[in-house]
Swiss-Prot record:
It comes from Helicobacter pylori (strain ATCC 700392 / 26695) (Campylobacter pylori). The lineage of its organism: Bacteria, Pseudomonadati, Campylobacterota, Epsilonproteobacteria, Campylobacterales. It catalyses: an N-acyl-L-alpha-aminoacyl-tRNA + H2O = an N-acyl-L-amino acid + a tRNA + H(+). GO terms for cellular component: cytoplasm. This is Peptidyl-tRNA hydrolase. Hydrolyzes ribosome-free peptidyl-tRNAs (with 1 or more amino acids incorporated), which drop off the ribosome during protein synthesis, or as a result of ribosome stalling. Catalyzes the release of premature peptidyl moieties from peptidyl-tRNA molecules trapped in stalled 50S ribosomal subunits, and thus maintains levels of free tRNAs and 50S ribosomes. The record marks D86 as: Stabilizes the basic form of H active site to accept a proton.
Amino acid sequence: MTLLVGLGNPTLRYAHTRHNAGFDILDSLVSELDLSFTFSPKHNAFLCVYKDFIFLKPQTYMNLSGESVLSAKNFYKTKELLIVHDDLDLPLGVVRFKNGGGNGGHNGLKSIDLLCSNSYYRLRVGISKGIGVIEHVLSKFHKNEEPLKNAAFEHAKNALKFFIESHDFNAMQNRFTLKKPLKIES
């Protein structure tokens, strides 16, 4: 089984903020597959099982995401872990993939690295840098950013659909990496 995790913060206060890119992309994927999440108190997360995948949205707040991930990983004895997360070091509209490595200062990844190791797949979605990191990642996208954000999230969702069918991270990486922001026609 593969554990596919979207990172974000719970509560309406953080809904659709830059830091919740992982939640939003997973929500879109689950909706398109005509599935739904159910809350698991055991893992303090919303879960959805599909084929040999477990979709997980930790409800621990970002800095403690590793607790939910470790709990689900151990309970389901998953072989692979893929984390979908925002990346402020990437421009908005860029989607990249990584296997292992550092956390880039992302607190959700720090928590996962500490409790689980740093050997997992990542789908990184650019949110661009702003003035004041905390304020920026916890802010909503500006109206003029919405078309590019929506296109990037759709691209990331399509990459995940490909991965679910292929079970091939390298093929997904080769096919769906966007080194430059998507071009949006107005």
